[in-house]
Amino acid sequence: MNQTPRLSPIRAALLATGVLLSAREVWAQGCVASRCPVNMSPGERLLRSVDGNADHGGEAGIMVTVGYRWLRSDRHFTGTHEEAYRQQEGSEVINNSSYVDVTLAKAITPRFALQLTVPWSEHDRSSVVWDDPDRAKRTRILERFHVQSGGLGDIRLGGTMWVLDPTVHRRGNVLIGLGVDAPTGRKDEKAVHRRLIDNANDIVGDDLRNVDQSIQPGDGGWGIPVDVFAYYSLAKTLSVYASGSYLITPEETNGVITSRSNPFESVMSIADTFAGRVGFDWLVLPKAGLTVSLGMRAEGVPAEDLLGGSDGFRRPGVAVSIEPGISWMKNGWAVQLSVPIAVYRERFKSVADRQWEAASGVPRHGDAAFADYLILGAVTKSF
């Protein structure tokens, strides 16, 4: 008969907190700028792998996690249709983005913990200048230019709580989280862009303006993140997990001017975001604390928010990925790595798209660039 490994109350609260919101980057799928945190790897197996080692760190009730996320987005989609011609003609917009976050968690009781997350991001975005502003008359690309942005993101303070007593219910449990996102990241980062000044003579000049919404460090509004994480042990070395996050943004727009041709996209929208994961994990080497996992992941931006309006410029959409991962935990340390590979991408029609259609009678459905894969990593130390 399989026995559930011992799990101290403090370790349960701490590890669940770190698992649920470790690697709290400003999540993004390229141009679809989702700002939702999702756990890097399933938690029950990590709890088991740590407590399978006698010397797994102190019981001070503190956990520090440093998370990392990298992506390159250059695949353009309108709805579910890929605009393959963009890469063929070399006009694709390319985002190279790196996100680093530091999360400090403190267990208050065996069931409740508080945490503070400070995110940082760095971006490089490149696009092209055509020889004519009229798309129908374009014949060649004059140049490709790059803009950079980065800095402090929107800081989050939140709490998590086990639904069931983790000292009693060790085989399965549900963790819920609630917090607040403060608009500490810059919403109006600017950079020098290149634009066509004289198409008759192919003259290109500089233009200082706000960078694209997808590479702004912050979104300019307050948010209410709601999180849930659940696990259930199917066998001694096999578990199923599920998690979800939704960021509620009551404010509608942030007042930052865009350079969009659609007048209904003249200012940036403050959009809700969502993310979720489900899958299995397998403790392959219990004594070494080594776990492998396989699951599905979805993240994106809805076309309409739960609260408040949804006007302004946003690129709503969703990316669904297969997510293999590996994790190692021992002596109070945890290292996690996963590489989600996209299998489905869709750019939704936005409120601004529909407003354009109603005003002009002309169909409109904007596009968005997505990544083929992501690289996610996190290192955690418990004290």
Where are the language model's segments positioned?
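Membrane-embedded beta-strands of outer-membrane beta-barrel proteins
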Residues: 102, 157-159, 176, 226-228, ...
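Surface-exposed strand-loop-strand hairpins of Gram-negative outer-membrane beta-barrel proteins
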Residues: 36-39, 70-99, 214
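Outer membrane beta-barrel transmembrane domains
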Residues: 77-86, 247-383
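Transmembrane beta-barrel strands of outer-membrane/channel proteins
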Residues: 64-70, 116-120, 176-182, 242-246, ...
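Short loop/turn motifs that connect adjacent beta-strands in outer-membrane beta-barrel proteins
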Residues: 29-32, 52-61, 73-76, 111, ...
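Residue-level signature of outer-membrane beta-barrel architecture
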Residues: 68-70, 106, 118, 161-163, ...
